[in-house]
């Protein structure tokens, strides 16, 4: 999700939003394919995000939709990458974004992956409905790394432009709570929204390391 898109939620027109965002950096957003897997099966990976306050969110990942994106997310989780990171950008009625190691929205894992979405030539029909997980990127389509966002509300203008790869199955109330927290002028929560521990259950399936750009 870019700053330009989020600005549309705060300004009277796209022109106003673009004028404001031209002075800002875009945030990071991205991607892989396992054949023969039925969509939405119990064998799909399940991610558990435990917040610092004890709240729990669970999400199902869809490797048959965005295989390299899922491989990347699982790889980072298994390395403990997300433990202690925050949701640094929160927009009520839109989405919550996290996964930046610096907590600024400008950091990443030190590499990029290919964007698995239709505008980048990759078939991905998963819509950005409430609870869907998707990868953040910069302007370049192949610039996703570790930052991801969870949809607070359905946002069809993102469909085909970002690599959606999973969906919240438990704890949407936690997403709502984070989305409704007070933020500053840059959409940063005033009270840090910390992911204490992020784990993944792969049900015995070994997922490969992601292909990097």
Annotated model-derived regions:
Residues 2, 13-17, 113:
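Exposed, low-complexity/repetitive linear segments and helix-based recognition motifs
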Residues 4, 9-11, 40:
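Aromatic (phenylalanine/tyrosine) cluster motif
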Residues 21-22:
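Cysteine-centered motifs
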Residues 34-213:
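Cyclophilin-like peptidyl-prolyl cis-trans isomerases
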